[in-house]
Amino acid sequence: MITRDKLKFLREHFDKNITVINPTTKKPKAVYQGNHYADGRKKYEWFNGWTDEELCSAEYLGVFHREDKRKDKPICAAVDFDDIDYVAHDWNIKLPPSMSVVKETKSGKKVNQRIYKVNGSGFPKIDYGGDSKDSGKLVETLQSGVSVIHAPDRTFTMIPPSQVDPKELEKNLNLICFFTEVQ
């Protein structure tokens, strides 16, 4: 659960694009919104109309990267650190300051994601390492889904998400991957 101050911060920077997360799937909680499949079954869909009370009482929260799931309306993107040894996580200091998701790990508290506002310049696509955390993935950028920002094992900093030069960010992410590989 989050405080009213933290929710006010989220509303200021993400407006209605805050969602309750299903703790089992780590995806937005699906809600029946009156729509049906062709065979008549109820259709459960992602939802962004949560009340402040529902958001404050939720154990898991996330922010959508795109407004109303529209590809042409990005609002934020995330740098996601996936290094199983947490070496890449420590190189987050090379990134421009912005809202961060801090996770409790076996190595202590680590920045797990850095979230940036997306402007007209775009956001770099980075997927460095293996196919998954277990197969050697170090860093990736997330732009089309949701970032889990609050859960029992993580919380977020109340630093406003900043806009970033995509070329500069890409250079810094490549540098982080290089430093992680040689460390």
Predicted segment positions?
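Signature for HUH/AEP ssDNA processing cores
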Residues: 1-110, 119
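DNA replication initiation modules
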Residues: 67-85, 108, 116-183
